[in-house]
Regions:
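C-terminal motif of bacterial Sec signal peptides marking the signal peptidase cleavage site
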Residues: 17-20
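Bacterial signal peptide processing site
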Residues: 22-25
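Early extracytoplasmic/lumenal segment of secretory-pathway proteins
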Residues: 36-119
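Extracytoplasmic ligand-binding site segments that recognize negatively charged/polar headgroups
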Residues: 53-67, 110-266
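A ligand-binding cleft/hinge motif common to bilobed small-molecule-binding domains
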Residues: 115-118, 280-295
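Periplasmic-binding protein-like
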Residues: 138, 249-253, 293-316
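Conserved C-terminal helix/tail region of periplasmic/extracytoplasmic solute-binding proteins
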Residues: 269, 376-412
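Mature extracytoplasmic/periplasmic domains
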Residues: 306, 310, 314-382
């Protein structure tokens, strides 16, 4: 069995921390409902319940409200009769909290790798029956059996699948080129070190940082390049010395940050009105801003980047499992995959979507990082065992990442 149990005991505590910062059983309508929590709940998709509730990142579940060209919800509703309701979450911790507190309320969640295993180990999500998802074999082989959504929970030597890959991408350095005068920033130092920007003014108070605890890994990526004596190899497996160094860098950054962002649309407003000029960000914000003003651009700093590979997971007490399975299948259609990749600036989980999509264009996947998969430090939940079997190694677990980053943001 994959070793992820050493942080299981803190899962509910993390949910409480996240909720501080930031039902009933459903009738499946299908057949064969195993009692074993390690087995899929249904063996065939029955009649839809008329609705499905999804927790997602902003921009992931679009019905054309922001831009009529991007709508993959309305066609699903028309085809299945399942009305989609969407709750957006701003951090992985918020997603975990919503799912753990939302039994009987939510069906699905688009979980990143720093949330997915917490949801599995707390039995908040259920294993999926891939036989009910006919398009699963179209998923990129890099993602089909990825460790952030496949776990051998019953110890039989075969991993169960808990998620359907959705999209993947990486965190970019968003900047305003009107401030940088055509000199694209090549290092994360622009958000970590006080300096004079090309417009002749200090960066102090004009940069932002992500307010999720997983951002500590971004500091570790920066330190790996600039302080090699620390010996950082994995930004999610930090020993005490490495972790303390990352915290010290983040405390230094605290003096520069104008806002810790978690709401993508608030960050868009901050850049649009000039309050922010550089920050870690998602391609989504860049795309929305650049559509109005081409001065808003992004770069990939030389130190490297963190990123996410998101999978759609089903709540153990999903009230609408039939509609949920219908959405899981729908989520893999080429048009949705390509349109979403164009909208968010990500790479589709279904690689055939990279060709022939009018919005994405045939060059879109390469532009969004298709060739960089092996260079991205994908989000994972930090564990005390450092992801290995060596009892001599000990890393700082995620609970402490959460509590310490909250303290940094609070000025402590």
């Amino acid at each position: 069995m994959r070793k992820i149990s050493r942080w299981l005991a803190v899962g509910s505590v993390i949910a409480l921390v996240a909720s501080a910062c930031g039902g009933g059983d459903g009738d499946s309508g299908g057949s064969g409902t195993p009692a074993d929590p390690d087995e899929p709940r249904i063996t065939q998709v029955g009649e839809g319940e008329g609705e499905v509730s999804i927790i997602s990142w902003a921009g992931y579940i679009e019905r054309g409200d922001t831009d009529p060209a991007y709508d993959w919800v309305t066609p699903f509703e028309e085809e299945t009769g399942c009305a989609v309701t969407n709750k957006t979450a701003n951090t992985s911790d918020e997603m975990v909290a919503l799912m753990q507190e939302g039994a009987g309320q939510y069906d699905l969640v688009t979980a990143s790798g720093d949330a997915s295993l917490r949801l599995v180990e707390s039995e908040t999500v259920q294993p999926l029956n891939l036989e009910l998802i006919e398009s699963y074999d179209t998923v990129d082989p890099n993602l089909q059996d990825a460790p952030w959504h496949t776990v051998d929970t019953d110890g039989d030597g075969t991993a169960e699948h808990y998620g359907v890959p959705y999209q993947w991408g990486y965190n970019v350095l968003l900047y305003n080129d009107a401030i940088f005068k055509g000199q694209a920033p090549t290092s994360w130092d622009v958000v970590f070190e006080e300096q004079t920007l090309p417009d002749g003014k200090s960066n102090k108070g004009r940069v932002q940082a992500y307010d999720g605890a997983i951002y500590i890994a971004d500091a570790a990526v920066y330190l790996r390049a600039h302080d090699p004596d620390l010996g950082i190899t994995d930004p999610y497996a930090l020993n005490r010395e490495q972790f303390d160094a990352a915290l010290n860098l983040l405390r230094q950054q605290r003096e520069l940050v104008g806002r810790y962002w978690h709401d993508a649309f608030v960050q868009i407003d901050d850049f649009g009105n000039g309050e922010a000029v550089a920050s870690s960000s998602w391609p989504f914000q860049r795309n929305v801003l650049a559509a109005e003003d081409p001065d808003f651009k992004s770069s990939t700093p030389e130190e490297g980047v963190t990123g996410w590979a998101d999978t759609t997971m089903m709540h153990s007490d999903a009230p609408h499992p039939n509609c949920a399975y219908m959405w899981l299948e729908w989520s893999l259609n080429e048009k949705l995959q390509g349109d979403l990749a164009a909208w968010f600036g990500t790479v589709p989980a279904v690689l055939s979507a990279c060709q022939g999509n009018e919005l994405l264009t045939d060059e879109g996947c390469e532009t969004n990082g298709l060739g960089d998969f092996d260079q991205i430090e994908f989000w994972r939940t930090p564990q005390a065992d450092c992801f290995d079997d060596d009892e001599a190694t000990e890393c700082v677990p995620y609970l402490e990442w959460v509590t310490q980053y909250v303290a940094v943001i609070g000025g402590r």
